[in-house]
UniProtKB/Swiss-Prot annotation:
Membrane-crossing segments per the record: 3-23, 32-52, 70-90, 118-138, 161-181, 187-207, 214-234
GO biological process terms held by the UniProt record: Notch receptor processing; Notch signaling pathway; protein processing
Protein's job: Essential subunit of the gamma-secretase complex, an endoprotease complex that catalyzes the intramembrane cleavage of integral proteins such as Notch receptors. It may represent a stabilizing cofactor for the presenilin homodimer that promotes the formation of a stable complex.
Family: Belongs to the APH-1 family.
Coiled-coil region list: none
GO cellular component terms listed in the entry, alphabetical order: endoplasmic reticulum; gamma-secretase complex
GO terms, molecular function: protein-macromolecule adaptor activity
Protein name: Gamma-secretase subunit Aph-1b
Signal peptide: none
Organism: Danio rerio (Zebrafish)
Length: 258
């Protein structure tokens, strides 16, 4: 049973993201490189926030429950702000790199657009964030032990998997909206991305009341998905044509001779 829980939660958490990687990124070496670089930037932000957290915990009063809870909130907020700061830094780096690629290219168009870079880097952020948030939980799911034996929630593992899935997809959508906001200098949109990231992270404080964190998180996920779709140039008409297989440009672009 523990093996079934492990694989089930793993596929829930990482299945959609791995599918996106395999179908849209894996065949393009340049996209793979940018995805790995995005994951590295997220990892550096985690390293810095962990360092600050370690220092503050050492100098704090460990016997004060109120102070420790305040430090936990501070750590979450600091981590989110550092992640978004590194997302902006990665945007600036990609902007310079794209200009360099254009200068070296023999064509008049960029080898990869900023919208594609936003999607790829966001997925890189999401992969690394999801891995660090759920790997230890998945390891514990293999046993030994019985979930909920001491009266705790029996939905701990599956709830964690669905939260990880939401975080991975949200990072992808946040990346698209964030980069588009930087391109168009819409600072209110940047603020909305940071605010929604803070809200989602702080919602985890209501656990183990998982319905109190999962439901609002997936509502935010739905809103950000629509926003990212519009930022990527999508429309209701395009969606309808794609679903009904009437978008001739899309079909021709994806046609492969047999």
């Amino acid at each position: 049973m523990t093996v079934a829980v492990f694989f089930g939660c793993t596929f829930i958490a990482f299945g959609p993201a791995i599918a996106l990687f395999m179908f849209t990124i894996a065949r393009d070496p340049l996209r793979v490189i940018f995805l790995i670089a995005g994951a590295f930037f997220w990892l550096v932000s985690l390293l810095l926030s962990s360092l600050v957290w370690f220092i503050t915990v050492q100098i704090s009063n460990k016997n004060s429950a109120t102070q420790q809870r305040g430090l936990l909130i501070f750590g979450v907020v600091l981590s989110v702000l550092l992640q978004e700061a590194f997302r902006y830094g990665y945007y600036r780096l990609l902007k310079k790199a794209n200009e360099g690629l254009l200068a070296l290219s023999q064509e008049d168009t960029m080898p990869i657009s900023m919208r594609q870079l936003a999607y790829v880097s966001g997925l890189g952020f999401g992969f690394m964030s999801g891995a660090f948030s759920v790997v230890n939980i998945l390891s514990d799911s293999l046993g030994p032990g019985t979930v909920g034996i001491h009266g705790e929630s029996q939905h701990y593992f599956i709830s964690s998997a669905f939260m990880t899935l939401a975080i991975i997809l949200l990072h992808m959508f946040w990346g698209v909206v964030f980069f588009e906001a930087c391109e168009r200098q819409r600072w209110w949109a940047l603020g909305a991305v940071v605010a929604s990231h803070l809200v989602v992270s702080c919602l985890t404080f209501v656990n183990p009341h998982y319905q109190g964190s999962l439901i609002p998180t997936y509502i935010i996920l739905s809103v950000m998905a629509v926003w990212a779709y519009l930022c990527a140039g999508g429309s209701l008409r395009n969606l309808k044509l794609c679903l009904t297989c009437k978008d001739k440009d899309f079909l021709l672009a994806n046609h492969r001779p047999r």
